[in-house]
Design a protein with these regions (language model features):
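Functionally important transmembrane alpha-helices
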Residues: 185-221
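Secretory targeting signals
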Residues: 49-93, 121-200, 237-256
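Central hydrophobic cores of alpha-helical transmembrane segments
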Residues: 42-49, 205-219, 234-237
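Helix-loop-helix units of permease transmembrane domains in multi-pass membrane transporters
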Residues: 94-130
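Aromatic- and glycine-rich beta-strand/loop motifs that create alpha-glucan
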Residues: 3, 9-43
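Membrane-helix interface segments
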Residues: 37-38, 113-114, 118, 204-209
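Alpha-helical transmembrane segments of multi-pass membrane transporters/translocases
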Residues: 38, 188, 242-280
Length: 280
């Protein structure tokens, strides 16, 4: 009986040590991604790309056009998939950088292959989400400073907001923006995870950064060719146009779909990373 209690204590102690190591590694990875020059460059680059491609549209806007209308137009601009590229910059290339600098083996030895993989995957997803969230809110802030109203009930032009009609054209308009921006950010995080996994196969930074846009386009085209329900198209999901009930339910379900997509590639990345380390 004494041996069993001691054995249980040892397992608990080991678990606590592993968790401390994991949190330390994750803290370091988040610092490398979110608190980095690449993160700032990605946010500012995405904002600049949005306004550079939308400047012609803005020149035709009237003072009474609101943020809902302008934001909706921005979602269909040329090169609108660039948000996937910029979101992948801080985190998706982590493995490429470690592999090229031969830092990966040292990192894996300090913790474990599993902790290394899971930590990189979480940091990649979080940084991609934050790039889109910060950039999109920066866009809205610039438009407000430009003089456009958040919402104009008297505007004759209204956008179809799907499940968000009730909160969009109301005093809770910023809650609408929070929901659709977070949905778009989760989409970016999911495809950044795909890019992170691909980086274990092709350790080329440029291929890694372009991969999310190509995957998004191919998946969307393939689902259309297979005549699958349109509400599951990435193009519909990422814009918050797929309806799964009310605004809250739609947000949770849509973000859950992208989160599940991201988890699949996080697991694949961890396994592929382990094999890459074992085989050199």
């Amino acid at each position: 009986m004494h041996w069993t209690a001691r054995s249980f204590y040892t397992k608990t102690e080991r678990y606590e040590v592993r968790m401390r190591v994991f949190w330390n590694v994750l803290k370091n990875d988040l610092a490398r991604t979110v608190c980095s020059k690449a993160f700032v460059a990605a946010v500012l680059g995405l904002t600049a790309a949005t306004f550079l491609t939308g400047i012609d549209e803005l020149s035709y806007m009237l003072p009474e056009d609101d943020l809902i209308y302008i934001y909706g137009i921005f979602q269909y601009l040329d090169f609108q998939l660039l948000f996937l590229l910029f979101a992948a910059i801080p985190g998706a290339a982590l493995f490429c950088a470690d592999w090229e600098n031969r830092f990966i083996r040292f990192s894996a030895q300090r913790c474990s292959k599993r902790i290394y993989g899971v930590s990189k995957g979480i940091a990649c997803f979080v940084s991609a989400v934050l790039v889109v969230v910060v950039s999109e809110w920066l866009d809205l802030m610039i438009l407000r400073l430009w003089g456009f109203p958040a919402v104009n009930m008297e505007n004759g032009i209204s956008m179809a907001l799907g499940a968000f009609d009730e909160i969009g054209y109301s005093e809770r308009v910023y809650l609408y923006f929070a929901a659709v921006i977070f949905i778009k950010a989760c989409c970016a995080g999911a495809f950044a995870e795909f890019a992170l996994w691909l980086s274990t196969k092709i350790t080329n930074v440029f291929v890694t950064l372009v991969a999310p846009m190509l995957a998004y386009y191919v998946l969307n085209t393939l689902m259309m060719w297979l005549r699958m329900p349109s509400k599951f198209y990435p193009g519909m999901l990422s814009k918050g146009l797929s309806v799964f009930g009310g605004a809250g339910t739609t947000t949770l379900v849509t973000c859950g779909i992208f989160a599940a997509f991201g988890v699949v590639f996080l697991v694949l990345f961890t396994r592929s990373c382990r094999r890459r380390l074992e085989n050199g």
